[in-house]
Amino acid sequence: MDVGRRRLLAALAAAPLLGAAAKKEPKRREPPAPRPSRRRKDAKPPEAHVDVAVVGAGAVGAWTAWHLVRAGEKVRLFDAYGAGNGRAASSLSSMMLDPVQGGDALYADLVDDSYDAWKRLSNSASLPILTPCETLTAPAAADTPAPPRGVDRESGVRLRTRFPQIAWREDEQVLRADKGAMIAGRRAVLETILDAQVEPETVVMPAPLLDKRRDLYVLPDGGTARGIVYACGAWLTELFPQILTPARLSAVRSLIFHFGPGQGDEQYRPPAMPAFVDRAYGFSLLPDVEGAGVRCWRSVPDASVDPDSFDRRADERALADTRQWLSARLPRLAAAPVVASAAAHDCRTATGDLLLDRLPGHPRVWLVGGAAGRAFSLAPAIGARVAAHVADPARAVESRWALERLMI
């Protein structure tokens, strides 16, 4: 047998073995489809002369600008420290969207529109902005809230099965809402501004200066605006000290702690863990998202502060109080390590309500602030309301949000 014939027979004998090896080789899997996202258009360069100047690039200011741009208005967005800065009330990593809103129908009616707006933004962002989670509210003894639409009452007995990581009293009656959410704080503000296609400007904006000859407001760089929205929260007292005294509107401090669950412990993450407003004990918590830990804080702020200068560090006394609450409500977390902490501020009015009204003597200048604990998550609906007022000067102001209520 010649060499060529031997090689041919050897090749034919090896062919079945090669085929078997090929069959055993696993199919190559295609990589998972990327998260749906759309490319955002770049922000347009600021124009000198615009329809509306928005002062304050927090959640309410960002959504006000967003709605104004969608309505066809030319907008400039100013913030003295820059959008999403560390001093802002909007700078925290997460915020709660609570459908219960303490049983207050005025704010509960803003939840659906806000949820939908945050969800649309989240669907177009590179990272999630809205994380759905159930929310629970344990009323205080003096509370008699009527459950808003979409909110049910649950007994402590049933909740022990659904959320065993929380200690429930058998006689507790808790308000449970399915359509709650956590909003990604500072990241959500920046995404809103990107989606509005407005370039935020780090500019210190003074009280309004009206050029009476042109009937336009003069901006710091010589530009003009037909109207101004001051959505700068606690900084309103610096701009309008004669109207908004500290007794009427102020920055209030909350001390926040993030507690880290153990390795592989997912019972403190959504959907296993809800957001929880414990009015019975005066504390609130948000579940662990993105590994940031379970966030806990006392629901009632502990002091009035200067938002420009107060120290953003939490203190040991507040930590001891928070651990005491955890030992009663979430005993397995009571000794968990603190993985992050901060002192943050929010803006509160004397009535506890939002302020949304015109500046006296300036029918095209709007003041927006207050509603501590609510304004961030409801910012899409609040911003829509502000934009509607700008478009329709005859639109009536919500009586509970009127400036005159603070002047009494």
Question: What residue spans do the PLM features occupy?
Answer:
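N-terminal secretory signal peptides and thylakoid transit peptides that target proteins
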Residues: 1-14
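N-terminal Rossmann-like FAD-binding beta1-loop-alpha1 element of flavoenzymes
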Residues: 52-76
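Short hydrophobic core segments
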Residues: 55, 224-235
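Active-site substrate-recognition segment that forms the wall
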Residues: 67-70, 128-130, 234-361
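Glycine-rich FAD pyrophosphate-binding loop
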Residues: 70-89
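Dinucleotide-binding Rossmann-like beta1-alpha1 core, especially the glycine-rich loop
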Residues: 93-166, 170-173, 282-283
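A conserved short coil-to-beta-strand element within the FAD-binding core of flavoproteins
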Residues: 201-216
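C-terminal catalytic lobe of FAD-dependent flavoproteins
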Residues: 332-408
